[in-house]
Amino acid sequence: MKKIEAIIRPFKLNEVKLALVKEGIGGMTVIKVSGFGRQKGQTERYKGSEYSIDIIDKIKIEIIISDDKVEKIVETIIKASKTGEIGDGKIFISSIERVIRIRTNDLNFEAL
């Protein structure tokens, strides 16, 4: 099993979600996150002074899937979230050792 974590632009969430549902993804975790990187943020004015805001709001989605679906799901996320501009986000892929559904004690794929 793999965990895919994708940091995307907030306005791309619905498009990504719909694309993932089309690929058979039945659920995901969505988290509001903030961070900085190459996008550099923006400059705003307040009472005549300029302020640099370098922490940008993003959305992080997490999905647990079987190893054989990773490449297709990564392609789907990229296609649905890409604008071609700095700040489109990142995708992280990691191994998951075990999943347990708390209510039923189901394990691994039965728990998803």
Swiss-Prot record:
GO terms, molecular function: ATP binding; enzyme regulator activity
Protein name: Nitrogen regulatory protein P-II
Record bears the keyword Protease: no
Keywords of the record: Chloroplast, Nucleotide-binding, Phosphoprotein, Plastid, Transcription, Transcription regulation
Primary localization: plastid
GO biological process, one term: regulation of nitrogen utilization
Statement: the UniProt record of this protein carries the keyword Chloroplast: yes
Encoding gene, per UniProt annotation: glnB
Entry similarity comment: Belongs to the P(II) protein family.
Superkingdom to which the source organism belongs: Eukaryota
Complex formation: Homotrimer.
Functional note: P-II indirectly controls the transcription of the glutamine synthetase gene (glnA). P-II prevents NR-II-catalyzed conversion of NR-I to NR-I-phosphate, the transcriptional activator of glnA. When P-II is uridylylated to P-II-UMP, these events are reversed. When the ratio of Gln to 2-ketoglutarate decreases, P-II is uridylylated to P-II-UMP, which causes the deadenylation of glutamine synthetase, so activating the enzyme.
One GO CC annotation: cytosol
Compartments (UniProt record): Plastid, Chloroplast
Modified residue annotations for O-UMP-tyrosine: 51
InterPro entries per the UniProt record, alphabetical: N-reg_PII, N-reg_PII-like_a/b, N-reg_PII/ATP_PRibTrfase_C, N-reg_PII_CS, N-reg_PII_urydylation_site
